[in-house]
Regions:
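Domain-level recognition of nuclease-like catalytic cores that cleave nucleotide substrates
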Residues: 164-169, 174, 178-228
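Nuclease-adjacent, charged terminal/linker segments that flank catalytic cores
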Residues: 1-79
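Surface-exposed alpha-helical segments enriched in charged/polar residues
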Residues: 39, 43, 161-168
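Conserved catalytic cores of phosphodiester-cleaving nucleases, focusing on short active-site segments
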Residues: 118-134, 138-159, 163
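Solvent-exposed, charged helical/coil patches
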Residues: 67-115
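Short, well-structured alpha-helical interface segments that form or flank functional binding sites
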Residues: 32, 36, 115, 158, ...
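Residues at alpha-helix caps and immediate loop-helix transition turns in enzyme cores, especially N-
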Residues: 16-17, 159, 187
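Ordered hydrophobic segments in well-structured contexts
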Residues: 89-91, 101-103, 119-123, 144-146, ...
C-alpha cells in the first residue's frame, strides 16, 4: 500500500465520515498528512471525554456552522472567515467546559502582528464564531493547541529553527506540537534543548509514536478541562 493510501485509510478509520471525492490518494501528501494528524486530535478528544455518554459531543460543521457528514478539508492556507473556501471544521464539547473548534490550515495573528499559517489549530468556539462574524484573524492567545505538521522524510535544522521562531511569535494557551512523518537526531536535539514538544515518525504503522502523540494531546485537553 502506498503512503498516501495508508494515510487515507487511517483518516477514514478514525473519523468514520464520508470524505470529499476530490480528497483521495492523488491528493498531495502534505494535505493528507495534515488531515491524518487532524484525525488524531479528534481521537484524542474522544478519548478524553467528547462523547455523549460522558456528557460531551463531537460534530463536524461546514463554513456556515451547519452540521455535516461530508468532510472537506482545506488544502491551502486560508482565513477562518473565508466564504470562498468550503471546508469542514470539528466542534469538540466536554461536559461543562467551553466548546472548542479544530481547524486545518488557518491564519493566526501573533505578537508581531503578522498573519502566520497554523497547520492545525484548536481554539475556543466562541472566539472562532466571533472571528467569522467580524471577519478577523484569530489571535494566538485564543488557541488552546497548535500543531506544525511536516510530511518530510529527511528533516533539516531549518525546520526546527522555523518552528522555534513560530512558537515565539504565536503563543498559545496550552500546547504547541511539532509533528513529522520523518525524523532527525539534530532536529530532535534542537527542539528538546529548547523545551519544545516534538513527535517524529508519526505515521500509520508506527503505533508507539502515534499513541505517544495522542496521549500528549489528551494531556493538553485534560489540562484545558482542569483550568475551566
Amino acid at each position: 500500500m502506498s503512503i498516501n493510501a495508508s494515510l487515507l485509510q487511517s483518516i477514514r478509520l478514525r473519523l468514520g465520515r464520508a470524505m470529499s471525492p476530490s480528497f483521495g490518494t492523488a491528493t498531495q501528501g502534505t494535505d493528507l498528512y495534515e488531515a491524518y494528524i487532524f484525525s488524531l486530535v479528534i481521537r484524542a478528544a474522544l478519548n478524553e471525554g467528547a462523547l455523549p455518554e460522558q456528557g460531551g459531543a463531537l460534530t463536524f460543521c461546514d463554513r456556515d456552522g451547519q452540521i455535516t457528514t461530508n468532510l472537506l478539508f482545506r488544502r491551502s492556507p486560508g482565513q477562518i472567515y473565508a466564504a470562498t473556501q468550503a471546508c469542514t471544521h470539528a466542534v469538540i464539547e466536554f461536559k461543562g467546559k467551553p466548546s472548542l473548534e479544530v481547524h486545518i490550515g488557518i491564519k493566526v495573528m501573533g505578537r508581531l502582528k503578522v498573519a502566520r499559517e497554523c497547520d492545525i489549530a484548536v481554539l475556543y468556539r466562541d472566539r472562532a464564531i466571533a472571528c467569522r462574524t467580524q471577519r478577523r484573524i484569530p489571535k494566538a492567545s485564543e488557541l488552546i493547541i497548535a500543531i506544525e505538521c511536516k510530511h518530510i522524510e529527511a528533516l533539516d535544522l531549518d525546520a526546527a529553527s522555523e518552528f522555534i521562531g513560530l512558537t515565539s511569535d504565536l503563543r498559545v494557551k496550552e500546547s504547541w506540537f511539532f509533528v513529522s512523518s520523518g525524523s532527525s537526531e539534530g532536529v530532535a536535539r534542537m527542539l528538546a534543548n529548547d523545551r519544545k514538544e516534538w513527535h517524529h515518525n508519526v505515521m500509520p504503522g508506527e503505533p508507539n509514536n502515534v499513541n505517544r502523540l495522542m496521549y500528549s494531546l489528551q494531556s493538553s485537553f485534560k489540562n484545558f478541562k482542569a483550568k475551566h
